[in-house]
């Protein structure tokens, strides 16, 4: 923040220096933000951005110019505009102008309508957000205003569960001391509630009349994208007060468990930190589009070459032969030489031969993409019945790109997980609870479990809580002391707040979902946390109210990884209760607990193996004298001016030792349904999945194991946590060394010390033996993304099977995606559900938003949306793969049929004096791509499939051809062109050879221009129809109708154009009456057509037959397998759920926030509001994933890792 030097210590508004009246910040770099409360006139001088957001690209005025500019970025559109201009020049126009202008206008119009429709829905979504209502204090009265009309300096009233409309300075709230609780999942992905507090001088401004008189001015930092930092000063009543991030409510947050609060708007609209992290809407193009632009340029070069050849031929012919015809065929007056005749002939042939890339290609592409989008929208298997939400293709231009994805970047919270924590299992005094066994002693699966435990004995039980093991409740009821102490610890050692609005209706306000789950479990098992004061905690233990004196809270932080409370019970006994990470607490236990420790560690291994989040519970008795002495030293440490945190940590370490082990808890962070199966399937499809989350490392790693991204079968999991550039570089170097040493050990024959180029190093790393994973923290990632280290990070990460980035900001998410796009040249997909994911969604080639959540920002920015992560496998492996396959087959066929059609003119030029005479009449040229051959190829492009959808999911390796660009690339393009040229040669020379000596039935000469044209045109239509029949892999009634219908339409139009009726109406246009009927009545003509068709098609049939038998690809094998299966009985395969076992690792994860204990002890948050507890659902099985993993590892050439694979830090 910049504060003018001349500002006095006692600030007064009248003394504001002239420099304050700055011009609009957007004219230059804004150095500081100034906002005065309740003074719109003053704030308007700075012309700050309004609170209106915009994700749309056009408006009414800009739509036409901007959209046309975008469309003419397509090389083909510019090419056709150029041809149209040429056709308007009479001297060189060999075809009517309407043959180009009609299709060009048609394709521009269709694309414009599609873009306008897409943008209309963006406008509609923007309006839904901008028109949300907010209560704004205007002229001393609270008025309902739309979000878009909120201005900087306005005072807004927020109520519970409302989204924050702009970046606000919290002034006051319904909670004591100006506290309020917010959920920031839309910003940083964390679901645990956070606390914000108004500064004391404004916390009492809860009355409208007081707020109306508030005229303080805030001077603070300019708009930026730093979510966790804010610095500013409030000047009011001749005093100044420092402001920090703890005083701010950011747009995208939700007010929770707070009845109301008031805030002063500091940043609005695009200046908010949320929008600063969102990035710009980019015009996305597919790799096929980019390739098409290149190919169109090549074709244009080929076209110029043909034009030059024919122009030179024209000049030579005119000079050598044409001079003889001058007597009765004189040149036009403007043509005075053979050279100039050749020059005009060049442009005429450019017009004639332009059909090698017809404009109808682009119309057809848009129609096909639209059809694919509708298939996605109509897919019932991607419809979520629970949320009544269908899948939606929000753009129609990226469908085939879905079949080429190599990297998926996924958010965690709300995307992979449900944000629901469930108390799943526990270990108490060496006994594990939570599993249910049948009469034979086998562990019961989820669907085989009996009714959940009945908690009806407890009137205060949470009815949503489910637990399946009745033996734990029996242990509580019989008064087992260890079990009672276990739940007593859970009911005392926490920072949860409680409220009871009605008798028996108890609500918990949990600062983290983990704590909410643990305290709720204790509540249902008879240890009900009822209330607290700054110095006491009241618990109902099996119906008896007991009040404990709260002596101290040893608060949680990410370094300690534990929290403790010290309480005195009614008998005067002092006891410390502690819960924390097993890696931390197990070293602080008394040696007498060793036997119990070994058993508990076995249980912890089991829980961690199931992907559960674990905590260890312990206690310690303290004598009065020791506690008093310790409390005095703690007080002195808390008052220290320097190294306060270090001194307190040392004091805490001292007391948290030699504790007695009670047991462990296992909480399930519930995954979205089908997440493990989806990740397994996508991994088998050679898609790498990176998780980018704002959550902490332990939580992210635990979810990695839960969803099977990380497994104990991995050779090693590298964890990068360096705080400096050197530390991060060293950790990345060691990771690469280990991977390369592993490859060397299996005979790759190189060492890390070998000097390798960057490209060679990358290829070596990607071929490493074994499976590795990389976990990197946000502060380390900031260094890894620096220009001089980003390649090292990328090489290391891409050599790993899984990558998890923790504590990352929205901007870092986008930077990671951009890094992969920049260097890997791979198709990327980003998927998320919150506003913190918008930036990476916009940056990736394809953005997917999870809909049905509270926030809609991710959906608004996305290209595709659906309600559950599991639908991603169907979007990619079915719709994406089919879209890519269909588009590739369509393009190959389209180029083939148009080269076969156009190149006939080239060969004809050598027999017509290079006069730019066409073989076909202009009506056939116009209708060939629009009527005669358009619908069959459209049907193939929309409906074709190589294997059914079930096989696409069953054989994910079918997805790999799209990733490798195997189905349409430069090689395939040249093959299609060669086939088209081959067909054109036969199409011209076989009829030419036959017609040279053929006669009609009456003995007259068969050869005339019109008969030859009809024969060639008919042969062409039949040959390309047979060819598309060969190319079609999935026949529908529509395919049959379009192919046979197109042939029928061709003959109908052909006979009509040569009929007496049209001649009578248009004698100058349709002069060749009866020519088609007479020509096609000749057996010689039909024999010629059949011969041409056979000679054109048989080599294709022979080649495909040989390839199918000698070198079939996977889709051929799958189709063959499918035929075999139809002849055999389908065998039912029973899949047994297999739990993950392996080496020891910590299952600890606890999403708690530091500083809450101090807040409780201060008594500032003792007045409570309600909390709606999360609903608990049963856990879904992910049994079959292990089989998929095993299947892949069996097929891999690298040997499996050893038994002990440590989690590397």
Curated annotation (Swiss-Prot):
Q: Where in the cell is it found?
A: Cell membrane; Endoplasmic reticulum membrane
Sites where the protein binds ATP? 411-413, 515, 556, 579, 613, 693-695, 807, 813, 836-837
Q: Does the keyword Metal-binding apply?
A: yes
List the Pfam families.
Cation_ATPase, PhoLip_ATPase_C, PhoLip_ATPase_N
Tissues expressing this chain? Isoform 3 is ubiquitous, with highest expression in aorta, cerebellum and uterus.
Q: So where's the catalytic machinery, residue-wise?
A: 411 (4-aspartylphosphate intermediate)
Which molecular function GO terms apply here?
A: ATP binding; ATP hydrolysis activity; ATPase-coupled intramembrane lipid transporter activity; magnesium ion binding; phosphatidylcholine flippase activity; phosphatidylcholine floppase activity
- For the ligand (Mg(2+)), the binding residues are 411, 413, 833, 837
Q: Give the top-level enzyme category.
A: translocase
User: Which residues are on the Cytoplasmic side of the membrane?
Assistant: 1-64, 113-295, 369-889, 943-972, 1032-1037, 1104-1209
> What is the superkingdom listed in this entry's lineage?
Eukaryota
Q: Which InterPro entries match?
A: ATPase_P-typ_cyto_dom_N, ATPase_P-typ_P_site, ATPase_P-typ_TM_dom_sf, ATPase_P-typ_transduc_dom_A_sf, HAD-like_sf, HAD_sf, P-type_ATPase_IV, P-type_ATPase_N
Q: Report residue spans for region: Disordered.
A: 1-36, 1181-1209
Residues assigned to the Exoplasmic loop compartment are 87-92, 318-346, 911-922, 995-1008, 1059-1078
Q: Which Gene3D superfamilies match?
A: Calcium-transporting ATPase, cytoplasmic domain N, Calcium-transporting ATPase, cytoplasmic transduction domain A, HAD superfamily/HAD-like
Q: Which UniProt keywords are listed?
A: ATP-binding, Cell membrane, Endoplasmic reticulum, Lipid transport, Magnesium, Membrane, Metal-binding, Nucleotide-binding, Phosphoprotein, Translocase, Transmembrane, Transmembrane helix, Transport
Q: Which GO terms describe its biological process?
A: Golgi organization; monoatomic ion transmembrane transport; phospholipid translocation
Q: What is stated as this protein's family in its record?
A: Belongs to the cation transport ATPase (P-type) (TC 3.A.3) family. Type IV subfamily.
Q: What the protein does?
A: Catalytic component of P4-ATPase flippase complex, which catalyzes the hydrolysis of ATP coupled to the transport of phosphatidylcholine (PC) from the outer to the inner leaflet of the plasma membrane. May contribute to the maintenance of membrane lipid asymmetry.
Quaternary organization: Component of a P4-ATPase flippase complex which consists of a catalytic alpha subunit ATP8B2 and an accessory beta subunit TMEM30A or TMEM30B.
What name has this protein been given in UniProt?
A: Phospholipid-transporting ATPase ID
């Amino acid at each position: 923040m910049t504060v003018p030097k001349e500002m006095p210590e006692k600030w007064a508004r009248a003394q504001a220096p002239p420099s304050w009246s700055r011009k609009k910040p957007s004219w230059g770099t804004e150095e500081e933000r100034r906002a005065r409360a309740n003074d719109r006139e003053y704030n308007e001088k700075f012309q700050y951005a309004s609170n209106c957001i915009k994700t749309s690209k056009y408006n009414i005025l800009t739509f036409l110019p901007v959209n046309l500019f975008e469309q003419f970025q397509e090389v083909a559109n510019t090419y056709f505009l150029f041809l149209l201009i040429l056709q308007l020049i009479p001297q060189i126009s060999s075809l009517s102008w309407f043959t180009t202008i009609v299709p060009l206008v048609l394709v521009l119009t269709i694309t414009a309508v599609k873009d306008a429709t897409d943008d209309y829905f963006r406008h509609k979504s923007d309006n839904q957000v901008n028109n949300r209502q907010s209560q704004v204090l205007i002229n001393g009265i609270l008025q309902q205003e739309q979000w878009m009309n909120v201005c900087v300096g306005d005072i807004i009233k927020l109520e519970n569960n409302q989204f924050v409309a702009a970046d606000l300075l919290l002034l006051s709230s319904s909670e004591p001391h100006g506290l309020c609780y917010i959920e920031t999942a839309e910003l940083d992905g964390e679901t645990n509630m956070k606390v914000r507090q108004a500064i004391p001088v404004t916390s009492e401004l809860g009355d409208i009349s007081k707020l109306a008189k508030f005229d303080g001015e805030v001077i603070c930092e300019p708009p930026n994208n730093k979510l966790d930092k804010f610095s500013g000063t409030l000047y009011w009543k001749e005093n100044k007060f420092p402001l920090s991030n703890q005083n701010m409510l950011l747009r995208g947050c939700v007010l929770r468990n707070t009845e109301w609060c008031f805030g002063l708007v500091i940043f609005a609209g695009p200046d908010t930190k949320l929008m600063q992290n969102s990035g710009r809407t980019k015009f996305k193009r597919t790799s096929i589009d980019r390739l098409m632009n290149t190919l169109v340029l090549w074709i244009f070069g080929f076209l110029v070459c043909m034009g030059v050849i024919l122009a030179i031929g024209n000049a030579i012919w005119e000079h050598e032969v044409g001079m003889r015809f001058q007597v009765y065929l004189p040149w036009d007056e403007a043509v005075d030489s053979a050279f100039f005749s050749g020059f005009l002939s060049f442009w005429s042939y450019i017009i004639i031969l332009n059909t090698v890339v017809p404009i109808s290609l682009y119309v057809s592409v848009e129609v096909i993409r639209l059809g694919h989008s509708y298939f996605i929208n109509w897919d019932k298997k991607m419809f979520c019945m629970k949320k009544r939400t269908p899948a939606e293709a929000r753009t129609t231009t990226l469908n085939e790109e879905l079949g080429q994805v190599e990297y998926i970047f996924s958010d965690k919270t709300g995307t992979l997980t449900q944000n629901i924590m469930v108390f799943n299992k526990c270990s108490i005094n060496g006994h594990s609870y939570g599993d249910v066994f049948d009469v034979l002693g086998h562990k019961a699966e989820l669907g085989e479990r009996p009714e959940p435990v009945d908690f009806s004995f407890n009137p205060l039980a949470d009815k949503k809580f489910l637990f399946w093991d009745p033996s734990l409740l029996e242990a509580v009821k019989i008064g087992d002391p260890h079990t009672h102490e276990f739940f007593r610890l859970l009911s005392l050692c926490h920072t949860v707040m409680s409220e009871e609005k009605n008798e028996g209706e108890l609500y918990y306000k949990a600062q983290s979902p983990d704590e909410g789950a643990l305290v709720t479990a204790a509540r249902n098992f008879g240890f009900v946390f009822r209330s607290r004061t700054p110095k006491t905690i009241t618990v109902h233990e099996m119906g008896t109210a007991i009040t404990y004196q709260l002596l101290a809270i040893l608060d949680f932080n990410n370094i300690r990884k534990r929290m403790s409370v010290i309480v005195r019970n009614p008998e005067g006994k002092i006891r410390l209760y502690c819960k924390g990470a097993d890696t931390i607490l197990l070293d602080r236990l008394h040696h007498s607990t060793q036997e119990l420790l070994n058993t508990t560690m076995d249980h912890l291994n089991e829980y961690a193996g199931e992907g559960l989040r674990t905590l260890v519970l312990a206690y310690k008795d303290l004598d009065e004298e020791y506690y008093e002495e310790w409390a005095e030293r703690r007080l002195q440490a808390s008052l220290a001016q320097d190294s306060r945190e270090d001194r307190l940590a040392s004091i805490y370490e001292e007391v948290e030792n030699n504790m007695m082990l009670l047991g462990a808890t296992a909480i399930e962070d519930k995954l979205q349904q089908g997440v493990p199966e989806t990740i397994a399937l996508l991994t088998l499809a050679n898609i790498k999945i990176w998780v980018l989350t704002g959550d902490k490392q332990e939580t992210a790693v635990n979810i990695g194991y839960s969803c099977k991204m990380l497994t104990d079968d991995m050779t090693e999991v590298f964890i990068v946590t360096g705080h400096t550039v050197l530390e991060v570089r060293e950790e990345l170097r060691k990771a690469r060394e280990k991977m390369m040493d592993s490859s060397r050990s299996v005979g790759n024959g190189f060492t890390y010390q070998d000097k390798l180029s960057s490209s060679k190093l990358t290829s070596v790393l990607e071929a490493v033996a074994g499976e590795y994973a990389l976990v990197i923290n946000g502060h380390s990632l900031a260094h890894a993304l620096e220009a001089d280290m980003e390649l090292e990070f990328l090489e290391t990460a891409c050599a790993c099977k899984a990558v998890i980035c923790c504590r990352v900001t929205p901007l870092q998410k986008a930077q990671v995606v951009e890094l992969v796009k920049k260097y890997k040249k791979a198709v990327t997909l980003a998927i998320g559900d919150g506003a913190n994911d918008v930036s990476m969604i916009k940056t990736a080639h394809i953005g997917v938003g999870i809909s049905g959540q509270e926030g809609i920002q991710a959906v608004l920015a996305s290209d595709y949306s659906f309600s559950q992560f599991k639908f991603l496998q169907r979007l990619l492996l079915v719709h994406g793969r089919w879209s890519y396959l269909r588009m590739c087959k369509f393009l190959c066929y389209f180029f083939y049929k148009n080269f076969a059609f156009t190149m006939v003119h080239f060969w004809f030029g050598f027999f017509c004096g290079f006069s730019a005479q066409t073989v076909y009449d202009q009506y056939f040229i116009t209708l060939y791509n629009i009527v005669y051959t358009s619908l069959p190829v459209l049907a193939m492009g929309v409906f074709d499939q190589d294997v059914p959808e079930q096989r696409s999911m069953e054989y994910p390796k079918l997805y790999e051809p799209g990733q490798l660009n195997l189905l349409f690339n430069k090689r395939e393009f040249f093959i299609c062109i060669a086939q088209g040229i081959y067909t054109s040669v036969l199409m011209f020379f076989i009829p030419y050879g036959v017609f040279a000596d053929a006669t009609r039935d009456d003995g007259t000469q068969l050869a005339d221009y019109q008969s030859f044209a009809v024969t060639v045109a008919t042969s062409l239509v039949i040959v390309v129809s047979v060819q598309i029949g060969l190319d079609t892999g999935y026949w529908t009634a529509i395919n049959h109708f379009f192919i046979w219908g197109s042939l029928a339409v061709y003959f109908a139009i052909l006979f009509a154009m040569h009929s007496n009726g049209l001649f009578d109406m248009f004698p100058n246009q349709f002069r060749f009456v009866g020519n088609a009927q007479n020509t096609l009545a000749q057996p010689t003509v039909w024999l010629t057509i059949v011969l041409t068709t056979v000679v054109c098609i048989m080599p294709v049939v022979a080649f495909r037959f040989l390839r199918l038998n000698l070198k079939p690809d996977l889709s051929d094998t799958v189709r063959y397998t499918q035929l075999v299966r139809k002849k055999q009985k389908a065998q039912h395969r029973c899949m047994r759920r297999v739990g993950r076992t392996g080496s020891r690792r910590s299952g600890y994860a606890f999403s708690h926030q530091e500083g809450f204990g101090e807040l409780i002890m201060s008594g500032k948050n003792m007045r409570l509001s309600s909390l709606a507890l999360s609903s608990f659902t049963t856990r879904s099985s992910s049994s079959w994933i292990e089989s998929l993993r095993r299947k892949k590892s069996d097929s891999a050439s690298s040997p499996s890792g050893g038994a002990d694979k440590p989690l590397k830090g």
